[in-house]
């Protein structure tokens, strides 16, 4: 039987300078009790503006600093908090591992999930999957979800203030989206959702690649100077949204297989996508 072609993406995507100040306005329809799963840097860079967005509101908020990797034990810890605090919405605030752990927590507990990436180092915020690790940092599995996140909110000023190495890593990750998708299409492989690859999915992946080539150098300069520019905004969209939605609707190929194997060799302090780029 011929594969059904399909597309999926986050239900809502918000990006721009000062977006954190609009968090409650944009997300209030989801619930009243919020668990923010934060990296250390994510908490420091976002907590103040998030609280400003809740001014005058009586919503319950709990900020929990994330333990480092999206491991089985860390996800279980967050699940327990959701249950005891009667949480409505899980919010990831941080990089790829915090995002993956929060997505898994929301999925297992049947809650809504919002993603606030604080670096543009991976396309994890927009994808419908998590990378799960063992407690020693080695790869465990991909956890696939029936849908993508309920919402993704990116404050461009937060990304501009993050170390430029993370932006470069995200560009390296996004660089492979089109070529991995093209390889999958040529070999008639299924998409990550086990369906046929759509023209829309390939168009998004190609636009991601073209955006990187056109704006990448200027975006790096902007990030080095901690300023938001049209070029930086374009690259943020490419690394977070275009790469994530593109990858979800095409497929991965050799670079991701290479990365998964390398995690078993140690050296987990290296930026995730630095390993992936080596395979490209």
How does the language model describe each region?
Residues 82-105, 109-118:
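A short, small-residue-rich loop immediately preceding and capping a beta-strand
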Residues 12, 33-35, 61, 88-91, ...:
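Structural motif
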